[in-house]
Structure formats: structure tokens, C-alpha cells
């Protein structure tokens, strides 16, 4: 039985909120196994409103194999 850490990044829209670079760096640096970014097929910055910001939330899950 092996234990494997699976790290998932979920992108959430937070209108009117700013996210510090330190927070983003801390979340992404703790996500060494896998990053999953769900996005529509056609995705571009021009399709986002001016007040749109992305917040990355790290979720760590232990999975038995």
C-alpha cells in the first residue's frame, strides 16, 4: 500500500478582490504533483471583465493506491 499526495489547484473568480503575489507563489510552490486548471475551450483575457481576478486555492488530498 502506497500513499500518494495529489495536489489540485482550483481557479475561482473573485470580482473586486486582489490576490497578492506572495499568496499565489505559496500556493503554487506547494503544488508539486499536479496542477489542474479547469477552463473553457475558448479562453482569453479579453473575455474577462475588467474587475475579474483569479484566486488559486490549493487542495491537498491523500489517495491510497
UniProtKB/Swiss-Prot annotation:
Pfam entry (one): DUF2689
Organismal lineage: Bacteria, Pseudomonadati, Pseudomonadota, Gammaproteobacteria, Enterobacterales
InterPro entries, A to Z: Conjug_TrbD_put
Keywords: Plasmid
Organism: Escherichia coli (strain K12)
Protein name (record): Protein TrbD
Amino acid at each position: 500500500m502506497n500513499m500518494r499526495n495529489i495536489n489540485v489547484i482550483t481557479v475561482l473568480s473573485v470580482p473586486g478582490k486582489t490576490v497578492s503575489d506572495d499568496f499565489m507563489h505559496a500556493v503554487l510552490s506547494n503544488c508539486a504533483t499536479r496542477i489542474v486548471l479547469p477552463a473553457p475551450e475558448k479562453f482569453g483575457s479579453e473575455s474577462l471583465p475588467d474587475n475579474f481576478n483569479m484566486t488559486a486555492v490549493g487542495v491537498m488530498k491523500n489517495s491510497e493506491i
